[in-house]
Amino acid sequence: MFALPVRKFHEPYYERKPSHAKKINGVYQTLTTAGMEVEDGIRKAKELLKENVNPELMRRALGIYLIHSRDAQRRKIVVPPLMSHVSFLSNRSIPPQTVSTTAGPTVVAGEVVTADTFQGPALLSYWREDYDLNDFHYYWHMMFPGTTVNVGGENIKLMDRPGEHFLQIVSQMVARYETEGLCWNLPLVRPWNQYDDILEHGYVPVPGLIEYYGGYPPFSSWYSVRNPDIPDLPQVDVSRKQMETWRDNIYEAIKNGYFWGKKQGTNAERTPLPLTPDNCMDLVGSVVDAEYLTLPPSPDGLSVDGDLYGNLHNYGHGNFAEISYQNYPTKAAQYGLMISNFGALRDPCFWPWHKHIQYFRRLASAKFPQDITAHRAHVRLSSLVICPQRKSTSISREDGITAFLGPPALNLLESKAKIGHEPYQWSVDIQSTRSSPPSEDSPQALTLRLFIAAGDLVNDYHSWIEMDRVTVHLTSKSTLTKVRLDTDSSIARKMGSYSELDPKSTSPWDRCRWPQHMMLPVGKVEGMPFVAFCMATDDTTAPRTRVPNSNTFEAIQSDQRLSDPLGMGYPFNRAWVQDVMDNAGKASIRQIISDAQTYPFMTTTTFRIFRATKMFQDSILNPYIPPASVTWFNTIKDYFLESDKTCMLYAYGYDLGNYDHVRLHSGAILDATSSKRMPLQMSPWSQENPDPNHPLWTPEMCDTFRAWMLNGCPKGTDSA
């Protein structure tokens, strides 16, 4: 059923069209009322498909059903991976009906494209088109379908603070994407704050998706009203002016400290619903994503006035998807990838739009600054280290961690490369400072929170990437060294690449974490500096909000490890009093987190991420790191013998004793020397049996020459 294609006779269905939400809710409720067992829902789904229900609609409804069915959870029946989708099966080299959904990826070795080839968003296509990243996003939207799940006529709230979760996942995706761009010296993403902005770069979906989704040329923008090529369907489009009104109303609400509310079904006057430190982030996120049903009603029965604030996030998806709409006479009408959770991340326009959505989180986080000592654990942290697990391997370095770009799985619609990194670990020393020392009878519980940020982004709250969160119990005052492997992370997805399930991790939450192989940015060849930050908190100081009890969702509710009692992304979820209230103007995040004397429950360290190339699945080639001290005068000019200079001047017209000539032809020189075609050997000597007095370049000489090139061919000073 997940592999069935959409035909022309099917009534259109688009995941990101808000007006289509009733369709999905209707089909989902039909499945849930079919019976208590999964087989009942499956049989009902088959009946609906025979009645020509759109297969794309059924994929989403059935996915939500399987995730939230108590019978499916008990029997560990999981949603098929994204590779079971018709778009992936159509790209297999054998007929789709004969393909097993457990077949491994067809990894094709080939060129790994880098900044030398692509510029702008195209350079990060390998990251956006990653199979596991898109599977994570697709599954996340079925796990949290945007509102509540209806069971027996009752709306069941799946999790506490859904609006806060929404803003956190958006902010973390943007932070990781921008950091990946910095690894290639790309600028930060420009947010789509102005709705008449333009997309400077175009986009064309990968070959397997161009049959289903449209692209757009450079310098595209939203239509002011609607794309004239789209059929006139009711409740499909929202004008740019209406979107701007919703946006400005939300801005005004955050600024004023309240949203307008009213009693449903009445014409009563609007009444302010105040924002507080406890509800601000969740309320703002729920309004931006139009998750009105998830908001608890106020004691006097008021709810947020949806007419004022609309459905900004989802209609924004639709406006971008309209840009790509193409009505081919021989194909089904095509929206862009932004119309679907299936592949929206692949489209570069996803990122400026969600950088804009992140700005609502930025505004909310600045509204109520927090004291970062309020939930401190009474401990002293020190000796924070993040490093490779095994330093004896061929790719491990003493001065950092190696990430790599390897061959993509083309049949799973990956593009250009597959990102990965060597296994790493982190550790920190913990010593209790509690007035009553911890013991076996009276342990001290605390939570360690690990984040990283690019060195240039340390002072931006929303650029910190959450890496791990773990509870530790101290039973003595002695120093404890806590060591965590990368696969232990509570943030990392508990499954292997290409949807390989871990039998030990079958909770629905386990697929809602960040892909394991993408936990680290790709880094730079010469090493990119990062800061790691660890904080110890006492979470018992903040009462945990729990989802209302429901047997139907018992397995989900008992395993809400994604929730954080101190706030999603704490302590970077809100501005710090220690920062914004500093009258001297000298405080900054960098300065605060480095002050171990004032804040002993925090510690930092620096490390580097080095980029390598993985040409095949089983081999990684370490790049040569350019030594910055090599210049023309102190090293390179001595590589060329007088006979070489005479030969090249006579045969090719350029002088190997001339700096400008060598710099101009450095690429050709490196190619000839590394392939041992130069220096040219004269009889009776040969390239295979070179003259000892006129030797070929050693590998070290070739590496040094290449390093000199990568550093811009520095000339240096003539000591003579």
UniProtKB/Swiss-Prot annotation:
Q: What is the organism field in this record?
A: Penicillium thymicola
Ordered alphabetically, the record's keywords are: Copper, Lyase, Metal-binding
Q: What is this protein called?
A: Cyclopenase penL
Cofactors required: Cu(2+)
Q: Which domain of life is it from?
A: Eukaryota
Q: InterPro entries recorded for this chain?
A: Di-copper_centre_dom_sf, Hemocyanin/hexamerin, Hemocyanin/hexamerin_mid_dom, Hemocyanin_C, Hemocyanin_C_sf, Ig_E-set
The annotation note on the cofactor reads: Binds 2 copper ions per subunit.
Function according to Swiss-Prot or TrEMBL: Cyclopenase; part of the gene cluster that mediates the biosynthesis of penigequinolones, potent insecticidal alkaloids that contain a highly modified 10-carbon prenyl group. The first stage is catalyzed by the nonribosomal peptide synthetase penN that condenses anthranilic acid and O-methyl-L-tyrosine to produce 4'-methoxycyclopeptin. 4'-methoxycyclopeptin is then converted to 4'-methoxydehydrocyclopeptin by the ketoglutarate-dependent dioxygenase penM through dehydrogenation to form a double bond between C-alpha and C-beta of the O-methyltyrosine side chain.
Q: Where does Cu cation B bind?
A: H313
| A GO term, aspect molecular function | lyase activity
Which parts of the sequence bind Cu cation A? H137, H141
First-tier enzyme category under EC: lyase
Q: In which pathway does this enzyme or protein participate? A: Secondary metabolite biosynthesis; Alkaloid biosynthesis; Mycotoxin biosynthesis
Task: Give the family from UniProt.
Answer: Belongs to the tyrosinase family.
Catalyses: (-)-cyclopenine = viridicatin + methyl isocyanate + H(+); (-)-4'-methoxycyclopenine = 4'-methoxyviridicatin + methyl isocyanate + H(+)
EC nos? 4.1.99.-
Keyword set includes Transmembrane helix: no
